[in-house]
Amino acid sequence: MTLWELVERRSIEAPEAISILFSEKHLTNRAFRDEALRVARGLRELGVGRGDVVAVQLPNIPEYLLSYAAICALGATLQPVHLPYRRAELTTLLGHSGAKAFVCLSRLKDERPPGLKNVVSLGEPEDGAIPFSSLLAKTSLEKPYDGSPDDRFLLLYTSGTTDNPKGVPHAQRGFLANAASSVPELEISRTEVVLSAAPLTHLYGLYAYHVSLCSGATMSLLPAFTPDGLSETVGKHKANCIFAGPAHFKPLLDGGLLERHDFSSVRFACLSGSPVPPELAAAVEKKLPKGKTLQLWGMTELQAGSFSRPRDPAEVRHGTAGAATPGTELRVVDERLQVRGVSLFSEYLKNPEETRKAFTADGWFETGDTAQLSGAGHLRFTGRVKEIINRGGVKYSPLDVEAIIDRMPDVARSAIVPYPDVVLGERACVFVQPKAGAAAVTLEAIMRELDRAGVAKFKWPERLERIEAMPLTPTQKVMRGRLRELLKN
């Protein structure tokens, strides 16, 4: 089944059920289908057809999902574009993909990338852009593309925390099977409300939508994350299943928002996107009146690779990323996590060399993560291969050390990266972003904290750099490559 066929099926089986909740508004399944067909007609008149790429740079609003469904109704491919990206990133990514159209907010970031002809914008159009409202005013597309599940429908780009982003094409069969198999494991029903704090421009946000679509559940849209905004939306829309990151829930904990707002509807909060400290997962669960915290591990190349289940005991849900998603296999070779399965991509776009390097001789994908698998198949991450620090031949991941430093009262966020050393090969430097108004953190204070925690001295950072704002990807991952460049300069 294709994504458009899922949209059609929902409109037939439950036409008046709610497809999307947004602020005080909603769209039924029938209304969503009808509006998507009008958008599809408008895109077709711009020349978009089977196999073409349409880039979308929108927040979590109905127009994003209407564009997505319309693109699939044409047999075309969605290219999500992160909201912070500006002309330099747009020129690179849209040039690489060969995007035929670009759907964005009312103002292009800086100016239109060269060679981009068809721009559809919300609000007042500029520079010859076409207003999105004119697409909604069209008559419906009469004959949606009768597509195959093996057709490409998504073109994602890796987050580029250490390297230049790579294009990752995906067919419908694998991704939708991955989402559909997640539904019974997460026990999601069509009467529930799914909410993603992650942007729809990122795979984690799209996964939440895929799960809601496959289950028949309602999708609650949060246009931009703020702690108050997330808390208020959960209460207003009675969200049951929340997909978010640790960076979304930590300010809710620190600010007491889980007590002040109504989270009684929440059945689970699934955390992903960056390492989840077990104590954070436990603290969130303690504050949820009826909910549990889960963890999920996924990749641009895979979608959901593993997750803990609501039925799992607390130590599994809080301390691991659970067991493999149905249809996915995991193995650890020399501490390196490898994966294969139905939703795994087959090749990087226009990049055979990176494709060759990404797979083992027997067909397993090298994730770039270091991990451990328990006897029961539960996955626990120990770091990234490129983040491992090799100090005099002794290798270690800095993640556990960072977690301890992050608990210090004056630290907002920390990240440890290696720097070259003539004697030992590498030593560790810690970058610290202080909390607003906090006292300056010293290397001596960090060493005392690590000493109290019983951390082996070879793991202690030997250099401290204070940074006003940690460089982050749009999905809140630390850009360690950028930090290493700062050290070089």
Model regions and ranges:
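Conserved AMP-binding/adenylate-forming core of the ANL superfamily
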Residues: 16-61, 65-69, 86-91, 133, ...
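Conserved pre-ATP/AMP-binding loop-to-beta segment of ANL
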Residues: 16, 121, 139-157, 163-164, ...
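AMP-binding/adenylate-forming catalytic core of the ANL superfamily
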Residues: 85, 102, 242, 341, ...
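Gly/Ser/Thr-rich phosphate-binding loop
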Residues: 214, 239-244, 253-316, 329
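ANL superfamily adenylate-forming
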Residues: 107-149, 255
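Conserved ATP/PPi-binding loop(s) of AMP-dependent carboxylate-activating enzymes
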Residues: 323-327, 333-358, 396
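Conserved AMP-binding/adenylation subdomain of ANL enzymes
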Residues: 176-193, 201-241, 255
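Conserved AMP-binding A3 loop
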Residues: 28-31, 153-177
